[in-house]
A protein has these predicted regions:
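Transmembrane alpha-helices and immediately adjacent membrane-cytoplasm interface residues
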Residues: 4-28, 60, 64
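N-terminal pre-ligand scaffold of iron-sulfur
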Residues: 16-47, 84-185, 191-196, 235-274
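Short Fe-S-cluster ligation motifs
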Residues: 213-251
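Short linker/helix segments within small regulatory modules
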Residues: 197-200, 224-225
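N-terminal secretory signal peptides and thylakoid transit peptides that target proteins
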Residues: 52-70
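Alpha-helical membrane-embedded segments
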Residues: 3-14, 71-82
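Short cysteine-rich clusters marking metal-coordination/redox-active sites
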Residues: 186, 205
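Structured cytosolic domains appended to multi-pass membrane proteins
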Residues: 188, 196, 209-214
């Protein structure tokens, strides 16, 4: 009741303000050119010249040159700040995947065999190097380096019926018995995706609903993503485990302005056959 009464009184006050205190006639203000009049410009220049003459800077070169030198030195801190930004990024078009690296379960680190997958199944995967250790038992990747590498190398492995897959030119041998491996990173803004529709072979991004057809080379069929999901060529090693044939021939990243330029560089590395 109190709140309702307060709102009512506020409404009445607004109405009274509009009726009694605010003017009811229109006022027109003429618009003028944004630039200053020539007379005003000349007057300002005359004032500046008069100030220079009164200060005597023109007759005192030491003071003038010291002032100019001090103004030039103001740019030096900017150079120091630019150096503090750190080294320029490099290797952003690559991931840790390479020829012969095993595809492993992203939780257990267990290598994956084709027999481990059923038709319609999806497994979240990573490169085996993330689980490898050195002679001291320390993981090869750890801390910020591990997180940065995982952000680009995360993958999904799916199995479909071979007859349902329509590979594009040059990709006929990128899979094993209907098993394909794709990047887990959405090409829109980089969200990790693994919402898998078994019947349609579609992969849905939960962030902005970009949808990719994994049976059709990761093609975008809905949503804001601007390019297909990168595919990792895979085969099996001598022990029957899934391994990468190479790194991703396409850049694993959200879209950015220089992407086309960087992709051309990567195409040259892979011979342009992707």
């Amino acid at each position: 009741m109190t709140l309702g009464g307060g709102l009512l009184l506020i409404g009445i006050a607004i109405i009274q303000w509009a009726k009694k205190l605010m003017g009811d006639h229109e006022i027109v203000e003429l618009r003028h050119a944004a630039g200053s009049e020539k007379d005003d410009i000349d007057a300002v220049l005359d004032d500046i010249n008069a100030g220079i003459e009164e200060s005597g800077i023109a007759r005192r070169p030491l003071i003038r040159n010291s002032l100019l030198g001090a103004m030039a030195a103001l740019g030096l801190p900017a150079i120091v700040l630019l150096r503090d930004m750190g080294p320029l990024p490099h290797g952003h078009t690559n991931t840790v995947w390479k020829k012969g690296m095993r595809v492993v379960n992203d939780v257990s680190g267990k290598p994956i065999k084709p027999s481990d997958l059923e038709v319609g199944q999806l497994v979240n995967a990573q490169p085996a190097v993330f689980f490898e250790t050195d002679e001291h038992g320390q993981h090869l990747y750890h801390g910020a380096e591990l997180h940065a590498a995982k952000a680009k190398a995360a993958a999904i492995v799916v199995r479909m019926r071979p007859e349902d897959i329509t590979p594009s030119a040059g990709r006929a041998n990128w899979g094993v018995d209907g098993i394909l491996c794709y990047s887990k990173i959405c090409t829109h803004v980089g969200c990790p995706i693994s919402l898998w529709e078994q019947q349609t072979h579609h992969l849905l991004c939960p962030c902005h609903q970009s949808t990719f057809d994994l049976a059709d080379n990761g093609k975008v069929i809905f949503g804001p993503a601007g390019r297909a999901l990168p595919q990792l060529p895979i085969s099996v090693d001598s022990e029957g485990y899934l391994v990468a044939v190479s790194d991703f021939p396409e850049i694993v990243t959200p879209s950015y302005p220089e992407l086309a330029r960087d992709q051309k560089k990567l195409d040259k590395k892979f011979g342009g056959n992707n």
